[in-house]
Structures are given as C-alpha cells and as structure tokens.
Amino acid sequence: MSAAFVTIRSAARRRLQDLRDALTTIPDGRTWRTCGLIYGLFLICAFPVGLLSGLVRANPAALTRNELVGSGLLLFVHPALAEEIVFRGLLLPRDSRSWPRRRLLLVAGAALAVYVASHPINALLFRPQVVGLFESSPYLALTTLLGLTCTATYLISRSIWPSVAIHWLTVVTWLWLLGGKALLR
C-alpha cells in the first residue's frame, strides 16, 4: 500500500469523523446566541444588496399549509442540510484551532469558492431557466455572504446545526416572503 493512499484514506476518515461529530454536537445557548448575532450581521449586510438589486422585495408566496410543510421539509434537506454537510461538514475542519491560520483561511476560502460556484453550475444542470439569476452579481454576492456566515457559525460552534438553521431560514424567508419564488419561475 502506497504512502499516498494511506494519507488519502486517513484524511477521508478524519473528514468523516469530523462530520459525524458535527452532526451529533448540539451547541449550548451561548453559542447559539453568538451564531444568532453573526446571522444578524449577515442580514444587515444582505438586505441592502437584495433590496437594491430587486432580489429581495415583499412578495409573499401564496402557499397552502401542505405546501408550506412539504416545501419547508424539502428545503431543510436540500439545500440547507445537504449543502452544509458538503461545504462545511466535509470540507472544513471541525476543530479550527488545531489548524495553522493560513491553512485554515486557504481551505475555508476554497470551500467558499466551491460553494458559490456550485449555484450557477446547479442552475445550468438542473434549472436552466434560472441561470441568469444564479449567475447575476447580486445573487452571487448574497450567496457569498451566506456562505461566509455559515462558515463562521460552523467554525465557532463546531456543529453543523447553526449553519443548517441559518441556511434554511434564509432560503425559506426569501422564497416564501421576499419574492424568491416568483424569481425562480
């Protein structure tokens, strides 16, 4: 067995162990409050971008209770949980303090870049009718801000759940209340 294979295998095991730990860690109240503060900072930055670009506007979607429950569950699984597992849980170290700062910034920056790039790529592959939206500078700026927020809360909490909650809350609020559903038609 080559040394490279052993290194890759041990790195993969470490990533999976980090993910398992991140999925089973529930932050304490103080950590949730810190993550809430970070989310508040995200909202302060994101709303002006969204309003000025027209990506955010008061336009509640007409949804039945069953549609709310169904779409809420679906949006929890994807994009919130699935994307946070991939782009935070698998790509980022759970214990960021054990990594040299430069390496952590490089890995976090690369994970963020892949996260942002995945949105227009997914649109090209699965929803070509919204490629223009997903490639627009304001949308990519908001995606970057959300990715930064989720990265920060993951690294602070060492848990996947604050970033999943933030991701889910942001997506459902945009789709259900702030015109996102209309923009995706």
Predicted features along the sequence, with ranges:
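N-terminal signal-anchor/start-transfer transmembrane helix
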Residues: S2-A3
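Transmembrane helix-loop-helix hairpins at the membrane interface
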Residues: F47-G54, L68-R185
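Interfacial transmembrane-helix boundary/kink motif in multi-pass membrane proteins
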Residues: V6-F47, R65-G72, S96-A110, S136
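Juxtamembrane/disordered regions of integral membrane proteins
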Residues: T7-A11, D18, L23-T24, S53-A62, ...
